[in-house]
Design a protein with these regions (language model features):
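Conserved class I S-adenosyl-L-methionine
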Residues: 3-10
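Structural motif
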Residues: 3, 43-44
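S-adenosyl-L-methionine-dependent methyltransferase catalytic module, highlighting the catalytic core
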Residues: 56-65, 69-71, 75-178
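Adenosine-cofactor binding site in Rossmann-like domains, unifying the SAM/SAH pocket
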Residues: 11-39, 47, 141-142, 147-163
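A short beta-strand submotif of the Rossmann-like class I SAM-dependent methyltransferase core
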Residues: 44-50, 59
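Active-site flanking residues adjacent to catalytic metal/cofactor-binding acidic residues
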Residues: 5, 21, 48, 81
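Residues at the starts of beta-strands that form the adenosine-phosphate
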Residues: 3, 17, 136
């Protein structure tokens, strides 16, 4: 059996083939945290627009924990706001309000509000993953993955929902554990 985790799933339910983990309060959640999963047990961890809620000092131990839970060769699939494309959107429009959401996003989480603390471009995200021992790092297309039918921020575009001609807001990268 393939063990797939939707980490930071929020209100998105990918169905019974996935384990849903989030710190929020949603009916479909299976767990609140990944910490109690056995080491080297998970085939795929998908985290869409989660990393940006942690600052650069916090993210290394978090990614190390996630990596420790992946089987050898297991996949960490990430989606984060793409700084290069946000900059391109700003250059095209001259309107900062068009990028404030993905750049400084906020979300209610229980009795508090959490905010984006950092941003990545392709080079910085790849360098971070390589420094932690991830290999075979590549971009992924939401149209070709098993969860592509579930619309989440990995499919965000400017103009909104212009998936044919728009600029992708999300940087989608996946990496293998130690290949």
């Amino acid at each position: 059996m393939t063990l797939k985790i939707n980490l930071g799933c929020g209100w998105r339910n990918f169905g019974p083939d996935w384990i849903h983990i989030d710190g929020g309060d949603y009916d479909h959640l299976d767990h609140k945290d990944i910490i109690n999963f056995p080491y080297e047990n998970i085939d795929l961890i998908y985290a869409s627009h989660v990393l940006e809620y942690f600052d650069r000092d916090e993210i290394v131990p978090i990614l190390k924990t996630w990596k420790s839970k992946l089987k050898p060769g297991g996949i960490l699939r990430l989606a984060v706001p793409d700084f290069n494309n946000l900059y391109a959107i700003y250059q095209r429009t001259g309107r900062i309000d068009k990028i404030l959401g993905p750049l400084y996003g906020k979300m209610p989480m229980g009795d508090k509000t959490i905010y984006h603390k950092t941003v990545y471009d392709h080079n910085s995200l790849v360098a971070l993953l390589e420094s932690l021992g991830f290999r075979a790092i590549q971009t992924w297309d939401w149209r070709t993955v098993e969860h592509g039918k579930y619309d989440d921020h990995s499919q965000a575009y400017y103009p909104h929902m212009d998936k044919e001609n728009g600029i992708p807001v999300s940087l989608n990268v996946e990496a293998h554990n130690g290949l």
